[in-house]
Amino acid sequence: MYKIKFTLFFYVLLSFSFIGKSAYAANDNINSLANSYANLVSHYYNEVSLSTQEMHNAIIKFVQAPDNNSLTNAKNKWIAARSIYGITEAFRFYGGPIDGVNKYGEEGPEGLINAWPLNEAYIDYVKGSPNAGIINNLTLEINNNTIIAANMSEDDADVSSGWHAIEFLLWGQDFSLETAGIREASDYLPTNEINIRRRAYLVATSALLLEHINWLSMEWLENGEGRKAFLNKNDPGGAILTGIATLAGFELSSERIATALDSGDPEDEHSCFSDQTHNDVKANFNGIINVYLGKGLNGESFRPSISEFVAKNNIKLHENILEIINETNISINNITVPFDKMLSEPKNGPGRQAAEKTVSNLLVLAKNFKEAGKDLNWEVIIAE
């Protein structure tokens, strides 16, 4: 994950405003922007697919030979894949393949991939309830159909699949402000029926996540249905800005940071078992930046970008966006790690203040994105 260097970005983006009209004209149209964005999305989903495959391979190796080393490796692969997936959440909220409904009436897989918060007892044993969850319910066969059917079947917190189900199965419950959950590798030794079911559940959930990620990757390939649908949108610029404005102005600021700040409950943090919520926040924010600037995972350039259109149309607004991006980057990096430790701080604690500042900055950023859309005659809707 690269870090934001504001001065560099500022002068690179500012230079776009001085590109001659003849040089810019070739790319100064909405079709070029839509294709560039589709290439960016495809790039990231391909990267997530590769990293999720690595995680799945590590999980299989762990289950085959459960010990602390193989468990740690599986956890590290989860963190690596998760950090890239978080960037792709900037591709949500406008009816795309991830969370929209396609022409066949089929809903995207987002709820099976990233639903949270998660009721741990719905899946497996928890403190005080040693026989809880699907894993301990011997009447249920552990397979894809069971996991999919169980996901949020009666309550939104009854999450059975996706990143956070895997996270819980790898880390277990987190009872400490200093460390993440500490599940024992011995939970996966094939010494009893429940452990065997737990092994099967972890592998099945990981395979299901990989299947959904691979599907998303294929949707955005050159001839993918999701890509075609996006390129046929009447207002692709508005869709792109809606995605990053909603992530900034609602999902990340409100749902993922402010809700936890208001409740003070670690259960409201995004990746509470692994203590990776701070990286979730950074990944989501990087997704917003990368869409705006047209940047790939390793700094690849996808042009034209939204930022070029904004800068050419309203350089002052573009400068304001870059400034608030820089300020938000600073406030995010000042949030206490781990996130649950920050939640335990008093209201005037430095980590809490940084989190509050991040929320307010993200709201300003979303407002600026919406203003940019209005200036460009694109419809930007901040979904809630």
Task: Label the model's feature ranges.
Residues 1-5:
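Positively charged n-region of N-terminal signal peptides that target proteins for export
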Residues 7-18:
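Bacterial N-terminal signal peptides
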Residues 19-25:
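Sec/Tat signal peptide C-region and signal peptidase I cleavage site
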Residues 26-384:
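Mature extracytoplasmic or organellar-lumen-exposed domains after removal of signal/transit peptides
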